[in-house]
């Protein structure tokens, strides 16, 4: 499996890969990028990724206005989801590790569901095991709606 990681700490992606490979006995090849625009560029260049893991706090915000931050995140993920398709034209699942402040049912999560981001990890699920589970088997639309 090939994974594009966009998390603000390389140790996180390394821990996820090690745990996944140990648990599922499958090798992961991966690349780390550190900006939202770098995700777009990488997806335009390489359509062979099987999964994308993005941390909501990938980039630091100078503004503490949550509405503006949510708009920025949504706009970036909207662009990324448009590019996130493989050579067969199928959507590449995006696993979003949400910030600590997120709660189920928030407007931004509903909007992300609308653009096909079904694998948001929030609250107590924000751990490496849950990310590994979603790497192995991303949520269906129905499962995401229930989550």
State where each predicted segment sits.
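Long, basic/Gly/Ser/Thr-rich N-terminal segments
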Residues: 1-146
